[in-house]
A protein has these predicted regions:
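Active-site-proximal alpha-helical segments within enzyme catalytic domains
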Residues: 322-325, 491, 552-555, 623-626
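Helix-capping and short linker residues that terminate individual alpha-solenoid repeat units
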Residues: 215, 287-291, 334, 359, ...
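Long, polar/charge-rich, low-hydrophobicity segments
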Residues: 359, 524-528, 532, 540-549, ...
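Long, K/E/R/D-enriched contiguous segments that form extended
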Residues: 483-486, 491-568
């Protein structure tokens, strides 16, 4: 028996010829939705023109390929025929890959935070045909949850407001757009005068503030969800090494007769505090479930404050920054609580993971689907790096979060034998019920391993790694993002130098060369442009984004492949001194319907316009937390 047509269920038929238009898109995230019954369109003028011609609002859905909750909402709602038919009848639906269009993501994240008080992915935004937002949220479940309406309830309320209270909807969209525009700074940030030393008191104050926010019990800062604070750790390590080059010499020699490097007691105190905070966080993360103890690499964040339940996607930008932080800790010399040798092992394993799991060889494209299982060592032929590994693994046709990484006590005993299996389960905090799900727990010691524990782990680790390679693997998003790749180039170059591994420097050089050959667009009559993404060796989309332009040349210069400004190409030059000062957050040629994200207007206005249009309140969630 055929499924009834939309008109049979009281929906108007969508316009003739309307269909899902994502199959030919290069973005892996967009192609994940190409089989949905929703008539998705890529972001662009044509989709907005279609909404204007039909006199319907736009449903804008923004996410990324590795996002677990994006997969959940896709399965629950976008694969559902009833939900799709309602969307097709009453909206023009647009899909955006936030990693390809961070400018679009930033505009509508500002609106989403203003309206709902939360942000995350999947992002669900309702727009006028001219692109102005009037309602927004993140994940919507198929059935109502406490404090959160169902997706169908939201669609029906938006459609009812559009048809019955159009004037209020348009007025509120205008209020939001003007509020966001008014919250923007009058001009781009510009620092007057030449760069100089930072004020020592300001740096010491920052260390003190971080000390007040530190989670001393578990390492890191703040509570759950907890993200690895790479930039904060970089600052703390640098401050521990040299608190400030503007700090005045001590008035008198140190009473203990030690060489203080010209620092006074306050400088020494904050330097010590910075070192201790960084060491506690680095140790906690590397011994936790956030870090893949078998293959290396860090998950994007932990759902819990103690780092024990990771959100399993692995992002290039996170791992590039964390690799460099661990390398810099090694260079600093470590502490007795977190020795440099232990950090060097984490750094080496992470560098190997970057090349083995995210590495892309020249002129090849693996078959669509999961990434190849990790090899025993890095691929020395890597010329570029993929952007991420998925949080989910598809097992028997079903998305299961973290399934590749989970173990049970019984599974360990079957693989290693009763004695070793039980010992590893105890050492690595594997129990039933699992810490993540009924499927088990990720391996993590939670403390420094030494003596017999370290010997046991070194003995069984190859066997465990081999067994895991034979499991289904998470998918890989193979687009190359220039800015993230630049971060990885810098990290690999530093790792190669500090860890005495020249093959990592060689890999950094090859990847830097790829960025120059594929992503850089020189211009004879002015500054060139760095294209943000490439697929299969072809750069596409937009260029000139602030998140891309500083990172890639910095990484290439660090790799020693392109020191400073190379003669003849001028490749990094436009990024160091923007004309008229400052930097732009979006591409000059980007077609945006809104303002770049800076800050959000007060939520009171959002509450008022939700009331005036009788839309469901977009309350902050209790669970789940969007990606």
């Amino acid at each position: 028996m055929r499924d009834p047509e939309p008109a049979d269920r009281g929906f108007p038929n969508p316009p003739s010829g309307a269909s899902n238009a994502l199959a030919a898109e290069p973005s892996a995230y967009l192609r994940q939705h190409a089989g949905n019954p929703v008539h998705w369109q890529p972001f662009g003028d044509a989709a907005f023109a279609a909404a204007a011609a039909r006199d319907v609002p736009v449903f804008l859905s923004i996410g990324y390929a590795a996002c677990h909750w994006c997969h959940v909402m896709a399965h629950e709602s976008f694969e559902d025929r009833d939900a799709a038919d309602y969307l097709n009848a009453h909206f023009v639906s647009i899909k955006v890959d936030r990693e390809e269009r961070p400018d679009v993501d930033a505009v509508y994240m500002t609106a989403t935070q203003a309206i709902s008080g939360e942000g995350g992915w999947p992002m669900s935004v309702f727009l006028l045909p001219d692109g102005r937002a009037f309602h927004a949220g993140t994940y919507y479940p198929p059935r109502p949850m406490p404090g959160r309406p169902s997706f169908r309830q939201v669609l029906e309320a938006v459609n009812e407001a559009w048809t019955e209270r159009r004037g209020a909807v348009e007025a509120n969209a205008d209020t939001l757009a003007r509020g966001i525009a008014a919250s923007q700074p009058a001009a781009a940030l510009h620092l007057d005068g030449p760069p100089g030393a930072l004020d020592a008191a300001l740096l010491a104050e920052a260390v003190t503030a971080l000390s007040g926010a530190e989670d001393r019990a578990h390492g890191g800062f703040g509570g759950a969800p907890k993200f690895p604070p790479a930039a904060v750790l970089e600052f703390l390590i640098r401050h521990a090494a040299v608190p400030s080059d503007s700090m005045p010499p001590a008035a008198a020699p140190d009473t203990a007769g030690q060489d203080t490097g010209g620092l006074d007691s306050a400088g020494l105190e904050t330097a010590t505090a910075a070192r201790d905070m960084a060491g506690r966080c680095l140790a906690a993360m590397s011994r936790s479930a956030l870090f893949d103890q078998l293959d290396g690499g860090f998950a994007r964040y932990s759902v819990t404050a103690d780092w024990s339940v990771p959100h399993f996607e692995k992002m290039l930008y996170d791992n590039a920054q964390l690799l460099r932080v661990y390398v810099h800790w090694v260079r600093l010399g470590g502490t007795p609580e977190y020795p440099a040798a232990e950090a060097a092992g984490i750094a080496g394993l992470t560098a190997d993971w970057l090349l083995a799991r995210l590495g892309l060889a020249p002129a090849t494209r693996p078959a669509p689907g999961p990434a190849p299982a990790p090899a025993a060592g890095p691929d020395t032929g890597v010329v570029a790096l993929a952007s991420s590994l998925d949080a989910d693994t598809v097992v028997d046709g079903v998305h299961a979060e973290g399934a590749s990484y989970l173990w049970t006590p019984g599974g360990l005993e079957s693989l290693l034998g009763t004695a070793d299996g039980a010992a590893v389960a105890a050492l690595m905090n594997v129990r039933m019920p699992g810490s993540v799900s009924a499927h088990g727990s990720p391996l993590h010691p939670g403390r420094e391993m030494s003596g017999g524990d370290a010997a046991l782990w070194q003995r069984v680790r190859p066997q465990l790694a081999h067994a895991r390679r034979n499991r289904p693997q998470p998918g890989r998003d193979e687009k190359v993002v220039a800015g993230w790749t630049g971060l990885a180039v810098a990290a690999l170059a530093d790792a190669g130098a500090v860890l005495a591994r020249p093959e990592l420097v060689a890999a950094a050089e090859r990847i830097a060369d790829y960025l120059e050959r594929v992503h850089w667009r020189p211009a004879a009559d002015g500054p060139g442009r760095l294209m943000r993404v490439s697929h299969e060796g072809v750069a596409r989309g937009i260029g000139g984004l602030l998140g891309t332009t500083p990172c890639a040349p910095k990484g290439c210069s660090r790799s020693m492949r392109l020191p400073g400004t190379p003669a003849g190409t001028g490749w990094p030059r436009p990024f160091w001194t923007p004309p008229a000062g400052g930097s732009r957050p979006t591409a000059a040629s980007g077609t945006l319907r809104g303002s770049p994200r800076r800050s959000r207007p007060p939520r009171a206005a959002a509450t008022a316009w939700n009331r005036s249009t009788a839309l469901p309140p977009a309350a902050p969630p209790r669970w789940p937390v969007p990606c």
